[in-house]
């Protein structure tokens, strides 16, 4: 007989068409993945990157979804997964000398953050 995996409740939030490249957003997401909600907010507040503002907004939305839709306690939430995918690129042109034009690519990305309740000590003992 096979064991059925225990389903954990997850709340997810997306931020679409955020101005900024996906690689620069991933640099920040890699540092907060697996951390608690409170620790992630503190880290995001003091990081010197421009992408921390939209990431904070998406993280707060995911926690609000967990609290409102699933009735979870925000103090027990952990960032289970966070990723950023490339969005459409807006192409613009910058005029240069002698009638030339340099192309400017304005990157966008889609940010997704998933939060779930941290496993408590009693749950860990039951699973073992």
UniProtKB/Swiss-Prot annotation:
Q: Which UniProt keywords apply?
A: Ribonucleoprotein, Ribosomal protein, RNA-binding, rRNA-binding
Q: Which InterPro entries match?
A: Ribosomal_uL22 (IPR001063), Ribosomal_uL22_bac/chlpt-type (IPR005727), Ribosomal_uL22_bac/org-type (IPR047867), Ribosomal_uL22_CS (IPR018260), Ribosomal_uL22_sf (IPR036394)
SUPFAM superfamilies with a match to the protein in the record:
Ribosomal protein L22
Listed GO CC annotations: cytosolic large ribosomal subunit
Gene3D superfamilies per the UniProt record, alphabetical? Ribosomal protein L22/L17 (3.90.470.10)
| GO terms for biological process, alphabetical | translation
Q: Which Pfam families does the entry link to?
A: Ribosomal_L22
| Gene Ontology MF annotations | rRNA binding; structural constituent of ribosome
Alphabetical list of NCBIfam families matching this protein: rplV_bact
Q: Which family does it belong to?
A: Belongs to the universal ribosomal protein uL22 family.
Q: What does the UniProt record say this protein does?
A: This protein binds specifically to 23S rRNA; its binding is stimulated by other ribosomal proteins, e.g. L4, L17, and L20. It is important during the early stages of 50S assembly. It makes multiple contacts with different domains of the 23S rRNA in the assembled 50S subunit and ribosome. The globular domain of the protein is located near the polypeptide exit tunnel on the outside of the subunit, while an extended beta-hairpin is found that lines the wall of the exit tunnel in the center of the 70S ribosome.
Assembly with partners or alone: Part of the 50S ribosomal subunit.
Specify the protein name: Large ribosomal subunit protein uL22
What is the organism field in this record? Prochlorococcus marinus (strain AS9601)
């Amino acid at each position: 007989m096979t064991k059925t995996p225990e389903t954990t409740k997850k709340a997810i939030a997306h931020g679409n068409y955020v101005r900024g490249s996906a690689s620069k957003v991933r640099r920040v997401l890699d540092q907060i993945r697996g951390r608690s909600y409170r620790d992630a907010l503190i880290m995001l507040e003091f990081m010197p990157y421009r992408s921390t503002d939209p990431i904070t907004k998406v993280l707060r939305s995911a926690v609000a979804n967990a609290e409102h839709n699933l009735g979870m306690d925000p103090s027990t939430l952990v960032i289970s997964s966070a990723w950023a995918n490339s969005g459409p690129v807006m192409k613009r042109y910058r005029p240069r000398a002698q009638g030339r034009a340099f192309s400017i690519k304005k990157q966008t990305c889609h940010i997704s953050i998933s939060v779930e309740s941290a496993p408590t000590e009693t749950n860990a003992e039951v699973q073992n």
